[in-house]
Regions:
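Interhelical loop/hinge segments that connect adjacent transmembrane helices in multipass membrane
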Residues: 1-3, 110, 140, 160, ...
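Signature of the first transmembrane helix
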Residues: 2-60, 115, 150, 210-221
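Membrane-water interface segments that mark the loop-to-transmembrane alpha-helix transition
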Residues: 5-17, 43-100
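Residue-level recognition of transmembrane alpha-helices
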Residues: 10, 14, 42-45, 81, ...
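Membrane-interface helix-loop junctions in multi-pass transport and translocation proteins
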Residues: 29-39, 103-109, 133-137, 146-180
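Alpha-helical transmembrane segments of multi-pass membrane proteins
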Residues: 50-54, 89, 94, 101-128, ...
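C-terminal transmembrane helix end/exit motif
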Residues: 63, 126-131, 135, 157, ...
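Membrane-interface junctions at transmembrane-helix termini in multi-pass inner-membrane proteins
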Residues: 66-69, 119-143
């Protein structure tokens, strides 16, 4: 019965997410009414997607791999993942002069950085609950994220008419909404124990995930 209920829940989740996504695409074409604004938004989205695997060092793969291993301490896996993202984001901050060279990025740099950080943190939490086999929560989060993204688009693009800035802000807040929901609903907060940082495990996780970065980047090229 658990398998049937989980399968049904994932089917509903996938259908709902795809249905909402079906409305989002034409809505964006309408809301981002200027070709220039749409082009800038698309370029910034691609830049975000390229920066995410670099900033996170592909640690999402390691969280699943080492989180599923019952011999590993769950808190250590979570803290190691958070430390990796923190380190990567610090490097990104130091590289701000280089990132600002991306076409059209300088004007939107704070929002671009917010998007990258929000996405990395959301992935940290969602991959961690996947490693704990909280499949129902994963399915619920998928619908919540898509729905919140649509609502944020309506607010920032139709009501406030913020253009490319609103586009980035909507994506960042949708990821943050998902992250906060999963962090508390999935009990991730119970694993926030900095003293459980495991340097040996961290090296193993990096050896596993670093080779994944080129593949993640090539997906968006």
């Amino acid at each position: 019965t658990t398998l049937v209920s989980n399968t049904l829940l994932f089917a509903i989740s996938n259908f709902s997410s795809k249905l909402l996504s079906f409305f989002i695409r034409p809505y964006l074409s309408y809301a981002l009414d200027s070709p220039d604004v749409m082009g800038v938004s698309s370029l910034l989205q691609q830049a975000t997607n390229l920066l995410i695997p670099v900033v996170s060092l592909g640690v999402a793969y390691a969280i699943i791999r080492f989180g599923l291993d019952k011999e590993n301490d769950k808190a250590s896996v979570f803290v190691n993942g958070a430390a990796t993202i923190g380190l990567g984001f610090l490097v990104l901050l130091l590289a701000m002069p280089l990132v600002s060279l991306i076409p059209n990025a300088a004007e939107y740099l704070p929002f671009l950085y917010l998007c990258v950080l929000a996405s990395c943190l959301r992935t940290l939490c969602t991959q961690f609950i996947r490693s704990r086999m909280l499949n129902r929560l994963v399915a619920i989060d998928g619908v919540l994220t898509t729905l919140s993204l649509l609502l944020y688009y309506l607010l920032f693009l139709s009501v406030l008419r913020m253009g490319a800035t609103g586009f980035l802000l909507a994506n960042a807040l949708a990821d943050l909404t998902s992250m906060v929901f999963v962090f508390f609903a999935g009990g991730c907060w119970r694993y926030c124990k900095p003293k459980r940082f495991d340097r040996g495990l961290w090296r193993e996780m990096l050896r596993y995930c670093l080779p994944m970065i080129p593949a993640s980047i090539s997906f968006w090229i």
